[in-house]
Amino acid sequence: MLRFAPSPTGDMHIGNLRAAIFNYIVAKQQHKPFLIRIEDTDKERNIEGKDQEILEILKFMGISWDKLVYQSHNIDYHREMAEKLLKENKAFYCYASTEFLEREKEKAKNEKRPFRYLDEWATLEKDKHHAPVVRLKAPNHAVSFNDAIKKEVKFEPDELDSFVLLRQDKSPTYNFACTCDDLLYEVSLIIRGEDHVSNTPKQILIQQALGSNDPIVYAHLPIILDEVSGKKMSKRDEASSVKWLLNQGFLPVAIANYLITIGNKVPKEVFSLDEAIEWFSLENLSNSPAHFNLKYLKHLNHEHLKLLDDEKLLKLTSIKDKNLLGLLRLFIEECGTLLELKEKISLFLEPKDIVKTYENEDFKERCLALFNALKSMDFQVYKDFESFKKEAMRLSQLKGKDFFKPLRILLTGNSHGVELPLIFPYIQSHYQEVLRLKA
């Protein structure tokens, strides 16, 4: 089984979605079940409704799953596994207070050495009646694993101490709950961000302590860097939020296309998630950080907009009139996102706001003069734009730039865009709706 394990503590990050996509693809390739596990054991950080938002985004992205579980439902199992380790003398109670440990951390900082928990501290404060935590006994050997992307990764014994499995309130720590559940659901491969590399030796030690004989394979994805700062994209970066990208009008298929492409060798530029299942390989992923490029994402989105079938295009733009399909196709040529396309068609069909667009009083007067001339015309009697243009010029007594700029604004709501002769047939059939001024 493969899994994607998001926490409902904020918006879904593109790095998380990338991991979800890769786990989903490999599950499909290997004909294995795909599990979604909502890691909701951190009650203080959970945000109400974020779990459903994550699931809706996954559905919208075309990612389906075979099983959905909430980690909090397994808390009794986590405690049972901790009890097992205590009985087998692989774990122990630690009574050291938070204050004591903070003092030791400060001491290590002042002495410019890494902080490492010492097992002898476990019973120093036992008589103070602190509720204990449960710790896994530190290893006396190195922990190494062969990462599917990073190759061999090794942690020496002095890099690992006796870490906490259960907190004072008997809630499981991230690494313990995560590992227990991975074993419970027989997860065989975990693809996740490289920020989890430091968690992996701890999870391997827990697996070994619990008697697992089937080692899990890990693949840690390089981080995604911001295109401007070159730093890791954080949750504060708008473009790192999948929700923001979707709201900006990026199609799910384009987002998936982009996230599969960056830091990867792909056989073609534009493809769907189903196509990627045919050829995707972890071996083709680079070990170097990927750089986010919004301009390239926009380019891919533009290509996918062009591939939309008529029915989907009408649905996504909320246009009910099939006669406007040709116009939508023309507008797509200059749009990078669905939001831009919707704005184009809205400006075309809505009353025009010349107050917003006029440069001076003279320009406003020219707009009004041309508007009055156009209102007296029956657009449908003209065989082409040229004959329409000549008559509009004659009636308005305008020509050149004084004619064309107001004309474009009155007919499209924009001062630039697709050539008017190309969209004139659509203007003709909708001119009564098109030729309106905002009050």
From Swiss-Prot:
SUPFAM superfamilies linked to this entry: An anticodon-binding domain of class I aminoacyl-tRNA synthetases, Nucleotidylyl transferase
Enzyme Commission number(s) from the entry: 6.1.1.17
Molecular function terms, GO-annotated: ATP binding; glutamate-tRNA ligase activity; tRNA binding
Keyword presence, Repeat: no
This protein's record includes keyword Cytoplasm: yes
Subcellular location, record wording: Cytoplasm
Main localization, broad class: cytoplasm
UniProt function note: Catalyzes the attachment of glutamate to tRNA(Glu) in a two-step reaction: glutamate is first activated by ATP to form Glu-AMP and then transferred to the acceptor end of tRNA(Glu).
Family stated for the protein in its record: Belongs to the class-I aminoacyl-tRNA synthetase family. Glutamate--tRNA ligase type 1 subfamily.
Protein name: Glutamate--tRNA ligase 2
